[in-house]
Amino acid sequence: LIGMATAYGETYLGVRYRFKNNRGKWICGPFVYMKKGLGIPFMAACYSFFCFLCALGMGSMVQANSAAETLEFTWGIPSVLGSGILALLTGAVILGGIKRIGKAAEYLLPLASGIYILFSLLVLLLCADRIPDAFLRIFQSAFGIRQVSGGIAGFGISKSIRYGISRGVFSNEAGLGTLAVLHGPAEHTTPEEQGMWAMFEVFFDTVVLCSLTALVILCTTQGDTETLSLTGAALAAACFSAKLGVIGEWFISISMVVFAFATVIAWYYLGQQAIEDLSLFSRIYPVLFLGAVFAGGCIRLEAVWMLSDLWNGLMAFFNLTALLFLTGEVEYPDRYI
């Protein structure tokens, strides 16, 4: 609920303070309402800098790694080749600008989401008898006696909260301010309408897609130590394969690659907006970004994950600070509630 409210606020302000530059292009995002709403250009510059770093980290390398891992696990495509293909496809899309980016997302994401939900429901239908036990394990792990006792309880709880929040933000991006950038170019709309769409996106991503994924993994891996030894996209693909065979594994793998690809091209746009605000690296940014996409599929990402968490936190700090001071300007018309 906090994430949904935050998504509404940042998107509302992003659309409210947006403006067109001399090329007729919408300029929008936290760096705009930090300048025009708060009058603090330094805060805007800090936000844009960390957004640029995130675009080269979690927005490109992490997503490319996930896609390459899926391609290698499902079809045996080497990671180097998989990340190279992803970089080429990304380059083809970004050469078309924001309109092509929007068109790609418009066609790819609904199809991939529909396939993912359909196959997830099929798996859960086949594992219906295990669903109650899956929920029981979730609540036992969260609130069990073992989890609140012992000398390291405080550390364990704080670590769980830390990773829960960081991965939740990684998933739905509520609080980072990126929704304000992505919704800003929408034509023939209002801040309220885009804010409501942003709220729905957070709900759909976290409550629907992430919950379905968790249930599928819990229901299909009971007692399966071999599958549990896998991680990331390979674990998800193996879980669907266990119940739906090769067809299920292929369709889910395609969906996960599409999700990763769509996220990559969205983060290219986010990084582009950030560097234009900073007036830095604009000429070499496409090369830097595509290089990061290629590298992401070829290297281990422990350090990238750690740095991405740090950069996410700094982005959220500046954005949430701006939201706090601009809360009074956010309106919630009754007709949208």
What is each of the regions a protein language model found here?
Residues 44-51, 73-98, 114-115, 252-257, ...:
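Transmembrane alpha-helical segments of multi-pass small-molecule transport proteins
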Residues 10-17, 121-137, 145, 149-152, ...:
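Extracellular/periplasmic helix-exit of transmembrane alpha-helices
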Residues 14-20, 51, 93, 168-191, ...:
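Helix-loop junctions at the membrane interface of multi-pass solute transporters
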Residues 2-10, 84-98, 109-129, 162, ...:
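Selective recognition of specific alpha-helical transmembrane segments in multi-pass small-molecule
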Residues 32, 36, 40-47, 83, ...:
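Membrane-interface alpha-helices at helix entry/exit sites of multi-pass transporters
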Residues 1-24, 205-210, 309-322:
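Extracellular loop-to-transmembrane helix junctions
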Residues 66-71, 77-139, 272-279, 305-328:
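Membrane-interface loop-to-helix entry segments
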Residues 1, 11, 15-55, 73-76, ...:
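Transmembrane-helix boundary/entry motifs in multi-pass membrane transporters
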